[in-house]
């Protein structure tokens, strides 16, 4: 937000006047119920397919659960508010874990690399949005490459649905 002062009133004024300078968040596709899918075998369906199957999976006869994405589209009669394009980010810890091939950002190896990035650049947002690729590569070439792929929208997404989390991969 572009605010005149760091007060609640100034923040509300900035939001209502459309002074939004960055629209960023995480990949909604990683959610457990992002797409319409079977809750038993996780096969994904379009809304029309699920409706045609009467919300019963033709593969395993499990229940098909309406995804958040399809629900949002169904409810989207409100006109969109003008704002900058949505920048999808992945938490730095998850990027590091994926690059290192470890199961969690909470492993000693992942935490040590995370701490090295924070020590060098100050905070996670700076790393994810602003740190120069060459400087990041001095800490970790793999993480630098992955962050660049994220910034450029080259992340491969595997949407979640039916209670199974989505996932991502770097090219």
Residue locations for each model-derived region?
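Charged catalytic cores and adjacent phosphate/nucleic-acid-binding surfaces used
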Residues: 1-171
């Amino acid at each position: 937000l572009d605010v005149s002062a760091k007060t609640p009133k100034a923040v509300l004024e900035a939001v209502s006047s459309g002074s939004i300078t960055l629209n960023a968040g995480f990949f909604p596709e990683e959610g457990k119920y992002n797409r319409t899918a079977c809750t038993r075998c996780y096969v994904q369906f379009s809304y029309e397919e699920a409706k045609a199957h009467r919300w019963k999976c033709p593969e395993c006869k499990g229940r098909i659960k309406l995804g958040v994405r399809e629900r949002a589209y169904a409810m989207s009669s409100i006109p969109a508010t003008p704002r900058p394009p949505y920048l999808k980010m992945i938490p730095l810890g998850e990027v590091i874990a994926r690059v290192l091939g470890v199961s969690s950002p909470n492993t000693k190896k992942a935490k040590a690399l995370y701490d090295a990035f924070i020590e060098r650049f100050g905070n996670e947002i700076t790393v994810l949005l602003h740190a120069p690729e060459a400087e990041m590569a001095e800490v970790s070439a793999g993480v630098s490459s992955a962050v660049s792929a994220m910034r450029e929208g080259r992340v491969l997404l595997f949407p979640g649905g039916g209670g199974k989390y989505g996932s991502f991969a770097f090219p």
